[in-house]
């Protein structure tokens, strides 16, 4: 077991462990092996380690170095999962250091950040510190963020640092998102019987036009001072069963990127406004909406003490857009 405090060697170890998210690639390795590695590493360096695994095979690790008391607590947060190994040029699990850069699956997003947090936390924990230090290394960031949600049901802190790749910019705000499936309902019929059929795909075109108009409206709307305006787009469309029939339904998957003040409820209201306006002039227009994943936007004030301290420490101003 390598318990190195050398960030380059630690990063090599992390890259070499397959941790592809099985929600993205069915049957993929997931996080168990890499969770075992970081648990042993933190235990060796004197941390108390808690393994959270409400979904079997999807563990998140929280390593804790208790403070002496009277100080503020700090949580480091990062994810252990990666996207697919497919399509990688070379062996994705064989890290290569070339011209001062490390190459391997997950290096950028975000095993380099994980290694940096582990080393930093161990360094602080080895010295007197009044506040608790927590390192939350979570499962399933690449799909549903379930790992961080599970951690936050058990732990909190006065401040948190997430070492996602930001090109070393300090990011104090981030957009959220809301996913919806909008299904337009028609009536199936043989292609020779237009009198019996209602073409769901043709009627879905009206919704797509309304969605495009909303996208342009959002682009013109004054937005968040850091994040700018939200946006919306149709991501996936499915409909029909065969070329010789009128389609009974057409489903459009929609993603809405939100800024503070926006939520799944406000997005659903926007979609229903478009759909109801179509129905008002077309009595045959029928639809249903199914909500999907939602992640709320966030914004930390630049005058927040932790924000100011981070900017002073790095001699950087917060990123102007994220």
Regions found by a protein language model. Give the residues of each.
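Short glycine/proline-enriched loop/turn "hinge" motifs that connect secondary-structure elements
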Residues: 86-87, 171-176, 243-247
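Metal-dependent amide/peptide-bond hydrolase catalytic core
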Residues: 1-2, 181-322
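Acidic/His- and Gly-rich active-site-bordering loop/insert found
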Residues: 2-105, 126-130
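Glycine/serine-rich anion-binding loops at beta->alpha junctions
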Residues: 100-116, 190
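Acidic/histidine-rich catalytic neighborhood of metal-dependent amide-processing enzymes
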Residues: 110-179
